[in-house]
UniProtKB/Swiss-Prot annotation:
It holds the Pfam family HbpS-like. This is UPF0303 protein ZMO1353. NCBIfam families: PRK02487.1-5 (NF002696). Belongs to the UPF0303 family. InterPro entries: PduO/GlcC-like, PduO/GlcC-like_sf, YBR137W-like. PANTHER family: PTHR28255, UPF0303 PROTEIN YBR137W. Signal peptide: none annotated.
Length: 186
């Protein structure tokens, strides 16, 4: 891996960490799950995205939707991405980035079979302030970075934060992503 690739990887890892720190809900319930899932669905309708969406507490689905032209495979991707969040307590994209940096897979590095875990972007932990991680939001059907971005956007909008300033592209514009986030949003 070249220096530029390493820098980009490190920048994305830092940006996702900031997203997970910032995108914490004051509470989470069935209505909020429905709002989050419906927001992502609305974007999918507007942009004709062939995605599947799920919002859940661990082991309790609260929202599921498969858009036109999505594949039955997307449901399996959702399951595997969600299992990654449940195991590592961080986004599936963050896990994938960290494994890539180490040069290992879930199987070679941790003994976890790829048929059960997907380390592609699109599943994000639902973290409740003063409670911790209680579930996940997952999207499947686009490029992994775009799946991740949809989930982040939904959480940002729900929290009343400017979605563009929580996006990976914004947070990785320079090596001061953390400082930039702290200055502009918090």
């Amino acid at each position: 891996m070249g220096n530029l690739q390493q820098l980009a990887l490190d920048a994305d890892i830092a940006a996702v960490k900031q997203q997970e720190k910032l995108l914490r809900l004051p509470e989470f319930n069935e209505d909020i799950a429905w709002q989050l899932g419906s927001y992502i669905r609305q974007i999918a309708v507007q942009k004709n995205y062939p995605i599947a969406i799920t919002v859940a507490r661990f082991n309790q689905p609260l929202f599921y939707c498969a858009m036109p032209n999505s594949s039955p495979d997307n449901k399996n991707w959702l399951r595997r991405k969600a299992a990654t969040v449940a195991h590592y307590y961080t986004s599936s994209y963050a896990v994938g980035l960290k494994l890539k940096k180490k040069g290992v897979t879930t199987l070679s590095g941790y003994g976890l079979d790829d048929k059960d875990y997907a380390t592609h972007g699109g599943a994000f932990p639902i973290t409740v302030e003063k409670a911790g991680i209680v579930g996940y939001i997952a999207v499947s059907g686009l490029d992994q970075r775009d799946d991740h971005a949809l989930v982040v956007q939904a959480l940002a909008v729900h929290l009343g934060l400017p979605a563009e300033k929580t996006a990976l592209e914004y947070l990785t514009q320079d090596s001061l992503g953390k400082a930039r986030l702290d200055e502009t949003i918090v």
